[in-house]
Amino acid sequence: NNNLPNQFYLSENYPNPFNPTTQFSYQIPEFSDVELAVYDIQGNLVKMIFKGSHKPGEFKVMVNSDNMASGYYMTVLKAGDLILTQKMMLLK
């Protein structure tokens, strides 16, 4: 299928800074074991968005800032040895 992405990709979130919600997109080129999560700047897990076997394609995610304090966070996409990150800022 020519519509499938050919590489892993994690976009920046929008809007950034955000309050109360933000969204981003990501691409998975093949069936993969994937972990998609938000971490605080100290490396603590804040929200696990997805963990498990993931089908290929392009996907959009909305993140709600419930139970999150103002500050910097990292969106992290892990697939095998690959790790992609994007920084985002919550302003309450």
Regions found by a protein language model. Give the residues of each.
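Short beta-strand edge segments in extracellular beta-sheet folds
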Residues: M88-K92
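Glycine-centered coil/turn sites that cap beta-strands in beta-rich domains
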Residues: N1-V38, K60-S65, A79
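Intrinsically disordered, low-complexity boundary segments flanking structured domains
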Residues: N1, I49-F50
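Short, surface-exposed loop/turn motifs with a glycine/proline- and acidic-biased composition
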Residues: F50-I83
